[in-house]
Swiss-Prot record:
Pfam families found in the cross-reference section: AA_kinase (PF00696)
GO CC list: cytoplasm
Sequence similarity: Belongs to the acetylglutamate kinase family. ArgB subfamily.
Domain of life: Bacteria
Family annotation (SUPFAM superfamilies): Carbamate kinase-like
Residues that coordinate or bind substrate: G41, G42, R63, N156
InterPro entries: AceGlu_kinase-like_sf (IPR036393), AcgluKinase_fam (IPR004662), ArgB (IPR037528), Asp/Glu/Uridylate_kinase (IPR001048), Glu/AcGlu_kinase (IPR001057)
Site positions for Transition state stabilizer: K8, K215
Catalyzed reactions: N-acetyl-L-glutamate + ATP = N-acetyl-L-glutamyl 5-phosphate + ADP
Organism: Streptococcus mutans serotype c (strain ATCC 700610 / UA159)
The protein's name: Acetylglutamate kinase
Main subcellular location of this protein, as a coarse class: cytoplasm
UniProt pathway: Amino-acid biosynthesis; L-arginine biosynthesis; N(2)-acetyl-L-ornithine from L-glutamate: step 2/4
Amino acid sequence: MKDIIVIKIGGVASQQLSGDFLSQIKNWQDAGKQLVIVHGGGFAINKLMEENQVPVKKINGLRVTSKDDMVLVSHALLDLVGKNLQEKLRQAGVSCQQLKSDIKHVVAADYLDKDTYGYVGDVTHINKRVIEEFLENRQIPILASLGYSKEGDMLNINADYLATAVAVALAADKLILMTNVKGVLENGAVLEKITSHQVQEKIDTAVITAGMIPKIESAAKTVAAGVGQVLIGDNLLTGTLITAD
């Protein structure tokens, strides 16, 4: 066991980091766990676009992103959300490093559908060696949800999908998908554990619905690809755990 944990946090969560979150990250790092943080930034991007009077358009839940929009998207992710995340972690005594120019050497991507979504990408390859160098130096690499095409274009990537790709590439012991809900609910209570074999049954019986479906399906595929377990919840310790069996 390498004790690698990949943590995905949303843009809103990264702006409102709790003391418990920061303490747990510090405790894990002190205990020798190897951590990687992937973050989105939808809230910050929307705010920046509104301030610049740029309309927000989404298709199938994905942000349509023009080349001009990417200037605002990258600014929000790197200079606002990522920078704030790094500052807060360092103030808590955590050794970490935000990846900026390094991203082009880590996340290879291709256009999802340029005609429909513009500069939105899907991960094609993770250069895990760059990430491993940070881990070997006892630093937490912080990755924004961005990637680069083979033509050198910066692309906007779904943070859940990027975190999943990173976890699979590193053969992580655990992937934590932090969201704004406590986990998968059944009859009002959080399901503490679901095996990957139970996922389709829970979808078919409408226990898992709407926006939780892609998260759970992604989690099941992640476990099938060799990641030990996936936790979906609103914190680092509790929620719904997805395992192989």
